[in-house]
A protein has these predicted regions:
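H-loop/switch region of ABC-family ATPase nucleotide-binding domains
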Residues: 153-154
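Helical segment within the ABC ATPase nucleotide-binding domain
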Residues: 132-144
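Short coil-to-helix segment of the ABC ATPase nucleotide-binding domain corresponding to the Q-loop/switch region
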Residues: 51-59
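Conserved signature/switch motifs of ABC ATPase nucleotide-binding domains
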Residues: 91-94, 112
Length: 193
């Protein structure tokens, strides 16, 4: 729950809805519709273990968006190609490496056609040799798609490379924020230095 302020997505409040010229706490239906525009990729992948990579990417579009199976599969195959895993479409998560599972999780989130992607420490549980695979997918998304990404990471070089804005958090609060050049080259706060 937001403690203070209002978050907007597409110029509409995310957790509140307009009513009689004021913002009031949003109804469950309003929240559900707004949440469907946000994709989330977790640190631990959270793939459905009983489903193949392809099925992991088609379940939500079929169940939530009401897509026909064929349409959802076509979209999922395009996304698996984007993350370099078309050849793994029929594999279950237990047969995939950590980096491959994370790339399927990214494709699954993208299958919902989000406006915003939340990426929570998506490389922290990966072996160092596969971190690059996942970062390359994020680089590609950053360059080729008009997609806002909010990423929690300890990969400072990567954050500097792809970000247009960096927020440094300490004890749950924003300590300093600004363009990457400012945060990394000329931080204003002692803690950030």
């Amino acid at each position: 729950k937001i403690n203070q302020g209002v978050i907007y997505l597409d110029n509409e409040p995310l957790t509140h809805m307009p009513q009689n010229g004021e913002l009031v706490e949003a109804s469950e239906n309003y929240l559900r519709e707004r949440r469907s525009k946000i994709g989330m990729v977790f640190q631990q992948f959270n793939l459905f273990p009983h489903m193949t990579a392809l099925q992991n990417c088609t379940e939500a579009p079929i169940q939530v968006l009401g897509l026909k199976k064929e349409e959802a599969e076509e979209r999922a195959l395009d996304l698996l190609e984007l993350v370099g895993l078309t050849d793994k479409k029929d594999e279950h998560p237990t047969r995939l490496s950590g980096g491959q599972q994370q790339r399927v999780a990214i494709a699954r989130a993208l299958a919902m056609r989000p406006k915003v992607m939340l990426l929570d420490e998506i490389t922290s549980s990966l072996d160092p040799e596969v971190v690059g695979e996942v970062l390359n997918v994020i680089r590609s998304l950053n360059k080729e798609h008009n997609l806002t990404m909010i990423m929690v990471t300890h990969q400072m070089g990567f954050a500097r490379e792809i970000s247009d804005r960096v927020c440094f958090f300490y004890e749950g609060k924003i300590f300093e924020q600004g363009p990457p050049e400012q945060i990394f080259d000329d931080p204003q706060n002692e803690r950030t230095k």
